[in-house]
């Protein structure tokens, strides 16, 4: 597993802890996203780093029992300091419908630090 693939798994573990149990450190989580980060969730909205920060602060522990499973993880393209990755994310919560999305992410590396530049999610019907 590449460091970029490992980061996909690690960040979803942190998100599961933050959103599902309210555990973790939001500032450390937000530091993993570049200041010019852009996210396109399944709704089609465009969320920048500030919008992501507002979302994470507001949603701490808001999804009790959240479990996130990442599979079908593949590196589409890589270069010396970055990669484009594609993966399936399955979210489950007690008494809630299963939420499945396919995601494409652009990650960059500076030294030993990996950061997220872009995340585009598409809901699986």
Name each region found by the language model.
Residues 2-28, 38-125:
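A beta-strand edge to alpha-helix "cap/lid" segment located at domain peripheries
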